[in-house]
Design a protein with these regions (language model features):
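Small-residue-rich anion-binding loops in enzyme active sites
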Residues: 1-18, 27, 144
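Patatin-like phospholipase
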Residues: 11-14, 22-118, 156-159, 168
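Extended hydrophobic secondary-structure segments that form protein cores and membrane-embedded regions
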Residues: 14-17, 51-60, 133-139, 194-196, ...
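Conserved small-residue
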Residues: 20, 62, 115, 136, ...
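Active-site gating loop/helix substructures
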Residues: 91, 129-216
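C-terminal helical/tail subdomains of lipid-metabolizing enzymes
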Residues: 202, 223-225, 237, 262, ...
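Hydrophobic, mid-to-C-terminal alpha-helical segments
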Residues: 204, 208-253
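A motif-centric signal for short, conserved binding hotspots located
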Residues: 381-432, 441, 449-454, 461
Length: 461
């Protein structure tokens, strides 16, 4: 049963897939390579990514791929369907008058028919045909809230959303403003909302939100963080090289600026997610964020690596594509960024395959996260709760430490993370020079002042 897999202890593996329209073909190039390497690693030529990843999440085009993988399709099968879908979905534009008056370029019916054919009557709550954890990100337009729709039965809103057909949720995730009309969904409680592309938010790259979904107590998964406990693989759709000159910007019209805004936003959202994920993780694929931050290799938040993290993506620049042996004109490079041009699919597929061959390495996937690795139990203990364990009484050995009362609130960065202390608490220095904080009352109950070894006054007061 799926629910047993979601509740099972042990290391967990997450897959996060960006939005990006037709550029999802690039994503599939990376996924084919990952699936091939993992199949070799597990000795199974028929290996599926649904067998490896315990939770797969996606936004917009990423939600189509995520759902296909979650029902057990191989990446190559999804790519074949993508090529069939692309021309139908983005083939026939609405007239310019329709675009001006109604605000969308494409008829959503071809997308609906294609997704219905793809996923049939599978609902979000189908615990048999959906083989792994699945999360689809969309945005509710009238409340401005980003929704994570997932299939864990213990979720707060699972009973209200479980009957929604996958094809309909995916349409909601992919209903990009100016491209398609919003999708209206009504849940089992009778609440009806208008939903648009999840990419119109910070979750166009959903990696950080997927990490929170896996670990926060507000959500039902409750997976334990740690670089040996969680692996998150994040895959992009490729990005345009947006660098330009002052002269070009001086000539940009109002419509030109308006057309560029989605790309600006998606770029910033992706950079922010990338920065947060590298700050939280151990990552062999860490990229330079900017010239000042570098790749954040030495900057770990609270001195704790909350997960292992892999990020695969490519910039459509002459430099990066040239390194792969792909030479394109400036006009063609600029055209690759379009999210709705099916004529780009062949070259995008080639870029994805070659980029993956170069970037995705077998040793990125540690044996710690091998599917057949013997499961080790990971327990999270929390202060304030009681546990039926055979506790025994112990007395601390007489190991001298140094301590100093601090008259104001303070923080201490320790190997375990950041400690918070209040005014009057003690800053303690241990025998190895390590610092930690000790509550004033606990300090008085635990320690007594002694002469400093070798004379010179007391070492604790």
């Amino acid at each position: 049963m799926l629910v047993e897999r979601l509740r099972r202890a042990g290391p967990k593996r997450l897959l996060s897939l960006d939005g990006g329209g037709i550029r999802g073909v690039v994503t599939l190039g990376y996924l084919e390579r990952i699936e091939q390497l993992l199949g070799e690693k597990h000795g199974d030529p028929n290996f599926r990514l649904a067998d490896y990843f315990d939770l797969i999440g996606g936004t917009s085009t990423g939600s189509i791929i995520a759902s296909g993988l979650a029902i057990g399709l191989r990446a190559a099968e999804i790519k074949d369907r993508y090529f069939a879908l692309g021309g139908k979905i983005f083939g026939q534009k609405k007239g310019f008058l329709n675009y001006l008056t109604k605000g969308y370029k494409y008829d959503s019916k071809p997308l609906e028919y294609a997704l219905r054919d793809f996923f049939g009557d599978i609902a979000l709550g189908d615990q048999e045909r959906i083989r792994t954890g699945l999360c689809i990100f969309t945005k509710r337009a009238e409340t401005f809230s980003t929704w994570a729709l997932f299939n864990h039965p213990d979720g707060m809103f699972y009973s209200q959303n479980r009957d929604w057909p996958l094809w309909q949720i995916i349409m909601a995730s992919a209903a990009a403003p100016t491209y398609f009309i919003p999708v209206f969904l009504e849940d089992n409680a009778g609440d009806r909302g208008a939903f648009i592309d999840g990419g119109i938010s910070m979750v166009n790259n959903p990696s950080f939100r997927l990490f929170l979904l896996a670990c926060l107590q507000s959500y039902p998964f409750h997976w334990v963080p740690g670089k040996d406990n969680l692996l998150l693989v994040s895959v992009g759709t490729g990005k345009s090289d947006q660098r330009t000159s002052n002269e070009v910007l001086k000539k940009k019209s109002l419509l030109g600026w308006a057309a560029a805004m989605p790309e600006y936003f998606m770029y910033d959202a992706n950079q922010m997610n990338q920065m947060i994920m590298q700050l939280l993780s151990e990552s062999p694929t860490a990229r330079v964020i900017d010239s000042e931050l570098g790749n954040l290799e030495k900057e770990k938040y609270l001195n704790f690596e909350a997960l292992s993290y892999l990020r695969y993506d490519i910039q459509f620049s002459a430099k990066e594509l040239g390194a792969l042996g792909i030479e394109l004109s400036k006009a063609k490079l600029e055209a690759l960024g379009a999210m709705d041009n099916p004529d780009n699919m062949e070259i995008l597929a080639s870029i994805g395959a070659k980029a993956a061959e170069s970037a995705v390495l077998a040793d990125h996937f540690s044996d710690t996260f091998h599917v057949n690795q013997s499961t080790h139990k990971i327990t999270l203990f929390e202060t304030g709760k009681s546990y039926p364990l055979p506790f025994q009484f112990y007395v601390k050995r007489e190991i001298p430490i140094e301590a100093c009362e601090i008259g104001h609130p303070f923080y201490v960065m320790t190997m375990e993370g950041l400690m918070h202390a209040k005014a009057g608490d003690y800053l303690v220095r241990g025998i190895h020079g390590e610092y930690y904080a000790c509550d004033r009352e606990i300090f008085y109950k635990t320690y007594s002042a002694v002469e400093r070894p070798g004379g010179g006054g007391s070492s604790a007061s």
